[in-house]
């Protein structure tokens, strides 16, 4: 009985360690340094926009780039909604660039790289949700390397709904994380994963 109990405890601890490890693996963050732009990509636009705006107000970059279209062609692009939030928070419109046509993270990366090249920018801080940061970083790194001369640093959005240690204990965190893991697996396997 004692061996069973000890085995159960060790097994449960191992499973919890793996689940916590997954959260920490997805939530990639680099040391903050000043850049030419702060890029927030669509998805959970509230937390992402708020984090990008806070970084802009702290002087990390002179330009905000909001990237993301709308799933409904009749509605306003996510990037435009983030811009409105930033302007309402006191960011001057001339300190904001909008890319409102991308529908996937891969398109975010390509269109942001185009925008940065067109403006002569070379460095960015990439802001997205913590559970999305790893996959976004892979896609942005591929695109930025392909275009040459572009660099970015990861800075996950402050997201009170997602905890890297406890994501597996409740929804929607659990669902978001599992979907993200599936997309990351598809990306690593060489399939398109948004």
Identify the meaning behind each predicted range.
Residues 23-169:
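A structural signal for short, hydrophobic/glycine-enriched beta-strand patches
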Residues 9-10, 55, 142, 190:
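Enrichment for repetitive, rod-forming helical segments
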Residues 1-29:
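N-terminal type II signal-anchor transmembrane helix
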Residues 18-21, 25, 52, 185-192:
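Structural signature of transmembrane alpha-helix termini at the membrane-water interface
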Residues 169-194:
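A transmembrane-helix-recognition feature enriched in membrane-embedded lipid enzymes
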Residues 3-4, 49, 184:
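Hydrophobic alpha-helical segments, especially transmembrane helices
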Residues 18-23, 45, 174-183:
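Charged, low-complexity, helix-prone segments enriched in Lys/Glu/Asp/Gln
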């Amino acid at each position: 009985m004692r061996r069973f109990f000890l085995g159960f405890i060790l097994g449960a601890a191992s499973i919890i360690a793996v689940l916590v490890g997954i959260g920490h693996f997805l939530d990639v963050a680099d040391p903050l340094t000043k850049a030419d732009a702060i890029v927030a990509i669509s998805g959970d636009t509230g937390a992402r926009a708020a984090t990008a705006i806070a970084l802009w107000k702290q002087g990390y970059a002179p330009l905000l780039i909001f990237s993301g279209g709308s799933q409904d062609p009749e509605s306003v692009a996510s990037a435009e909604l983030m811009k409105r939030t930033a302007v309402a928070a006191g960011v001057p419109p001339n300190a904001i660039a909008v890319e409102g046509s991308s529908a996937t993270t891969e398109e975010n990366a390509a269109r942001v790289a185009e925008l940065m090249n067109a403006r002569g920018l070379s460095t960015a801080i990439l802001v997205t949700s913590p559970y999305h940061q790893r996959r976004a970083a892979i896609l942005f790194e591929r695109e930025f390397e392909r275009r040459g001369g572009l660099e970015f640093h990861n800075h996950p959005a402050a997201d009170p709904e997602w905890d890297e240690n406890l994501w597996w204990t409740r929804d929607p965190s659990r669902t978001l994380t599992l979907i993200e893991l599936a997309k990351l697996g598809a990306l690593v396997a060489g399939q398109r994963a948004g």
